[in-house]
Regions:
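Core Rossmann-like FAD-binding/catalytic domain of the broad FAD-dependent monooxygenase superfamily
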Residues: 1-366, 370-373, 377, 493
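Short, conserved active-site loop motifs that form the nucleotide-linked donor/cofactor pocket
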Residues: 114-115, 120, 286, 425, ...
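Short, flexible hinge/linker loops that cap or flank conserved catalytic cores
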Residues: 155, 280-281, 419-421, 451
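A glycine-rich beta-strand to alpha-helix segment
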Residues: 156-157, 462-463, 471
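Short, internal strand/loop/helix patches
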Residues: 162, 438-455
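Short, glycine-anchored, charge-dense loop/turn motifs used at functional sites
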Residues: 293, 457-467
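C-terminal helical "tail/cap" subdomain of flavin- and related membrane-associated enzymes
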Residues: 320-425, 430-440, 455-456, 467-474, ...
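Short, flexible beta-strand-to-coil junctions
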Residues: 429-433, 450, 461-462
Length: 493
């Protein structure tokens, strides 16, 4: 019996597996596909995901094989300079094709001894919810747990299961979770292929077409290939069916008057502008993350990042439930915190689709919005939203930092994010007078100072969000159990 089964071996599932393994959780990843994807749908990490990778010591791996990019206000096809005073020590993204992201995250998961099984299709799921609370012993009583059936008849059991299996999630469907939203109204073809046309001619034609159609692009990718994006002719009845090269040629000619001599495709796909969100991210011992929990148009490049950040929020909480120290309701905070974030992405991508329209009203709106984004405050708001560095969870009233993720700061002895590689809670204490005795197995107490930090002490959750700010020991003790459970019974508090 596994502690956790993760269904889906994309970026979300692999990130979650790594987070669980940091805490010693016995996890297996079940991926339907027999081999890793070649499709570069997700094209980069935004600033918050860059922070996530830095917090786990992975950023250097991404920077070694990818380039930074710095575009602020990437909204509805409108690009502006990076805004001043955005609250991050990483004011950039990393241009990472999805196959590279998956490879690096898979390497990380395997290094941490997560088991990744490919060619494993889940076709059935059942759960027993006896003793399904978040606290000590959850999953250990009365045979409580989750059973999955694979297409080959194999059955596997675990204490918890997380569906990270994409927008057409089998796990979500087997759970019967409603997935309300808007169906696709437009469709776009996307693929990588070779071309025979001269690069300068391609660039000139693309520039002309994009004056009126922003859902169009033919640009160099890798290995001599070109990434082709072109509006489809209507919305297909079955988006799971791959388009053909002839479909691409037809639509390229329709929009550009030429097909650029496209040939020898590496992969071809289609996507629509449908937007939906699961009503619940948790049903008993089963949870949903990534595209299994929310789908939306890819405008702004937020999808892969949203899934990675779902996993970052969930991993430590699920590990706490498995380890038996999770306070009551901790797993429910996953839905409470991440559902509003997903809803905001669904909303802003719908707005971006409107801005990408070709009718006169959309063009006028885009011109107006572009002028508004020249204002620093507007650009900072939009960039903070797209990059997710402005996400604040509702922890109630308190200090202005409460619920925000803490940006990296320089300390006298190190950097803040360097202290977070093990995925534990962190008390950064500039007073030297505080104590987390009783929680030392869950929280690192660091006495250090930073010229960038004007608060006496700050308590960070394993995902880097601020759980407490202050200097009073009794006040700290009143907040520790909320996120880190009861103190170890042998410790003096």
């Amino acid at each position: 019996m596994f502690d956790v089964i993760v269904v889906g071996g994309g970026p979300t599932g692999l990130m979650l597996a790594s987070e669980l393994r940091l805490h010693g959780v016995d996890v297996v990843v079940l991926e339907k596909s027999a081999k890793p994807t070649e499709q570069s749908r997700g094209q980069g990490l935004h600033a918050r995901s860059v922070e996530v990778m830095d917090q786990r010591g992975l950023l250097d791996r991404f920077l070694a094989v990818n380039e930074k990019f710095q575009v602020g206000g990437l909204f509805g096809g409108i690009m502006k300079a990076w805004p001043d005073r955005l609250d991050t020590a990483h004011p950039y993204g990393v241009a990472t094709p999805q196959p590279v992201t998956e490879r690096l995250l898979n390497e990380r998961a395997v290094e941490l001894r997560a088991e990744v099984r490919r060619g494993c299709e889940v076709v059935g799921l059942s759960q027993t919810e006896d003793g399904a609370g978040d606290g000590a012993g959850a999953g250990a009583k009365d045979g409580a747990g989750v059973t999955v059936e694979l297409a080959d008849g194999t059955r596997l059991r675990s204490r918890y299961l997380v569906g990270c299996d994409g927008g057409r999630s089998t796990v979500r469907k087997l759970l019967g979770v409603d997935f309300p939203g808007q169906p696709a109204t437009v469709e776009t073809l996307l693929g990588e292929m070779e071309v025979t046309e001269d690069p300068a001619t391609i660039a000139s034609v693309v520039d002309e077409v994009r004056k009126t159609q922003l859902r169009f692009g033919v640009a160099p990718s890798e290995n001599g290939l070109y990434r082709v994006v072109v509006p489809a002719d209507g919305v297909s009845e079955d988006r799971a069916t791959e388009p053909t090269l002839d479909d691409f040629k037809q639509q390229l000619r329709a929009h550009a008057g030429t097909d650029f001599g496209v040939h020898s495709p590496r992969w071809l796909s289609r996507f629509g502008d449908a937007s939906r969100q699961a009503e619940r991210y948790r049903v008993g011992r089963v949870l949903l993350a990534g595209d299994a929990a929310h789908i939306h148009p890819p405008t702004g490049g937020q999808g892969l990042n949203l899934g990675v950040q779902d996993a970052f929020n969930l991993g430590w909480k699920l590990a706490a439930a498995v380890d038996g120290w999770a306070p009551d309701g901790l797993l429910d905070t996953y839905h409470a915190e991440r559902h509003p974030v997903g809803a905001r992405v669904v909303e802003n991508t719908r707005a971006q689709i409107t801005l990408l329209g070709t009718d006169p009203g959309a063009t006028a709106l885009r011109e107006l919005f572009s002028k508004l984004m020249d204002f620093e405050e507007v650009n900072r708001y939009v960039t903070g939203m797209i990059t997710a560095v402005d996400v604040r969870y509702d922890f109630g009233e308190g200090h202005e930092l409460l619920g925000l993720r803490m940006r990296d700061v320089e300390l006298k002895q190190s950097r803040l994010y360097e202290l977070m590689h093990e995925g534990r809670g962190l008390l950064l204490d500039q007073t030297g007078r505080l104590s987390v005795a009783g929680w030392a197995d869950r929280i690192d107490h660091v006495v250090d100072v930073s010229e960038e930090l004007d608060v006496p002490a700050v308590l960070l959750r394993p995902d880097g969000h601020v759980a407490w700010v202050g200097e009073d020991q009794q006040d700290l003790l009143s907040q520790l159990p909320k996120w880190f459970g009861s103190p170890h019974h042998e410790a003096a508090v």
